Amino acid sequence: MFINRWFYSTNHKDIGTLYLLFGAWAGMVGTALSLLIRAELGQPGSLLGDDQIYNVVVTAHAFVMIFFMVMPIMIGGFGNWLVPLMIGAPDMAFPRMNNMSFWLLPPSFLLLLASSMVEAGAGTGWTVYPPLAGNLAHAGASVDLTIFSLHLAGVSSILGAINFITTVINMKPPAMSQYQTPLFVWSVMITAVLLLLSLPVLAAGITMLLTDRNLNTTFFDPAGGGDPILYQHLFWFFGHPEVYILILPGFGMISHIVTYYSGKKEPFGYMGMVWAMMSIGFLGFIVWAHHMFTVGMDVDTRAYFTSATMIIAIPTGVKVFSWLATLHGGNIKWSPAMLWALGFIFLFTVGGLTGIVLANSSLDIVLHDTYYVVAHFHYVLSMGAVFAIMGGFVHWFPLFSGYTLDNTWAKIHFSIMFVGVNMTFFPQHFLGLSGMPRRYSDYPDAYTMWNTVSSIGSFISLTAVMLMIFMIWEAFASKREVLMVELTPTNLEWLHGCPPPYHTFEEPAYVKV
């Protein structure tokens, strides 16, 4: 029964597949929006109308990519598929809640799209700062619809987080300790804890904004004793952990991919990797105000947030060097997934380096809200999170589908994407250092060259996305079945064959420690 299987599903594999399909679809929408942005900025002068329309596109691009592409694919897709298989659990702890978590996302997405359709759209940027997001500068229902959309996506993530935490803690075989679970399982659990602690703060902030807009409260209005800076604190207390939520599952996937294709039976420094992720998770909560260096904070406050932010580089460095140590002395197989992982390690490190630059409050005063910041977070997202997703996808595709991708196409796809994203985002560092501000649809002629280069790069990335669609079609059309998977004793998820049966681990697994 199609309806029973796909709409009322309680199977972690089916729900994971739904998440992957939804995320892929949302990714197409987000990519289309990003190309609209780059088309507008390809040359000076106006292309798509006024700055309001431009900012609606920018805002939608951010929300779609974060809440409907990266999070559903990484946590919902890979998390649902792999976590139960990796710990030998029959399913997630709360299978029906798992289904609800997924089905909250399409309505949420619908509300976000609706916000662009009514009035002038929500041209607030993804941060939704008042007073721009207030009912004076944004009259009409657009921002309210965006807020409701975020509420639904937030509830979905909170329920998913509860589910993953419960599953990882309670559904392991009796003999398996927490320190014997694979790193991807750890990364998803830590991500879930971050979601559980940060999302309620966002919910509070946007609910206060909702009442400010509609019920005459003045939480963020100085005229009634409120303060717009309060909103920024609430938002970024969520917003900073959020960026670690987006990258941590990627860390977990990269650990698995690097270990597997180095022919190793375990990653280098397992405990160090776990503690590094826990440290990143903890530190992620105490650095939020580095997004607010320009609002006039006390010098001591700025000194603290600068130092605390730089300390995050230490556990991150532990992870990077542990990946390199895992590669060391290995029998390296240059598969497409390994190329994505190596690309991730290099480009994520470059993104982290520009992050260290921006952590300096004095430098950030100059660079805040310029394209330098855009370049920084797109290096860690577009070449961190997305490369991890791509690597994870080509690595686990045979597990999900039972078919193999064409190796040559996959390598060509990687090469095109690698050139495209670097050509898009590297020039943005130069634009930022020259003072080009973010969120403007037009710019002085002096910035033309690097903007043109950046826009050409974005179209190269588009061809890579189209090639990936072809590649997936080719795999399903050719139906090359999986012959053999190596290293299954240390990669539990492959144990049941490709694809695994509908129900796995129906009896508790016997784990010999």
Swiss-Prot record:
Its cofactor is heme; Cu cation. Signal peptide: none annotated. Belongs to the heme-copper respiratory oxidase family. Residues 41-50, 118-140, 213-227, 287-298, 358-370, 434-446 are mitochondrial intermembrane. Fe(II)-heme a binds at H61, H378. GO terms for cellular component: mitochondrial inner membrane; respiratory chain complex IV. Cu cation binds at H240, H290, H291. One of its GO terms (biological process) is mitochondrial electron transport, cytochrome c to oxygen. The keyword Transmembrane helix applies. Na(+) binds at E40, G45, S441. Residues 1-11, 87-94, 171-182, 262-269, 328-335, 401-406, 479-513 are mitochondrial matrix. Pathway: Energy metabolism; oxidative phosphorylation. It is found in: Mitochondrion inner membrane. The keyword Lyase does not apply. Component of the cytochrome c oxidase (complex IV, CIV), a multisubunit enzyme composed of 14 subunits. The complex is composed of a catalytic core of 3 subunits MT-CO1, MT-CO2 and MT-CO3, encoded in the mitochondrial DNA, and 11 supernumerary subunits COX4I, COX5A, COX5B, COX6A, COX6B, COX6C, COX7A, COX7B, COX7C, COX8 and NDUFA4, which are encoded in the nuclear genome. One of its GO terms (molecular function) is metal ion binding. SUPFAM superfamilies: Cytochrome c oxidase subunit I-like. Mg(2+) binds at H368, D369. Component of the cytochrome c oxidase, the last enzyme in the mitochondrial electron transport chain which drives oxidative phosphorylation. The respiratory chain contains 3 multisubunit complexes succinate dehydrogenase (complex II, CII), ubiquinol-cytochrome c oxidoreductase (cytochrome b-c1 complex, complex III, CIII) and cytochrome c oxidase (complex IV, CIV), that cooperate to transfer electrons derived from NADH and succinate to molecular oxygen, creating an electrochemical gradient over the inner membrane that drives transmembrane transport and the ATP synthase. This is Cytochrome c oxidase subunit 1. Keywords: Calcium, Copper, Electron transport, Heme, Iron, Magnesium, Membrane, Metal-binding, Mitochondrion, Mitochondrion inner membrane, Respiratory chain, Sodium, Translocase, Transmembrane, Transmembrane helix, Transport. Heme a3 binds at H376. O2 binds at Y244. The chain crosses the membrane at residues 12-40, 51-86, 95-117, 141-170, 183-212, 228-261, 270-286, 299-327, 336-357, 371-400, 407-433, 447-478. Binds 2 heme A groups non-covalently per subunit. Binds a copper B center.
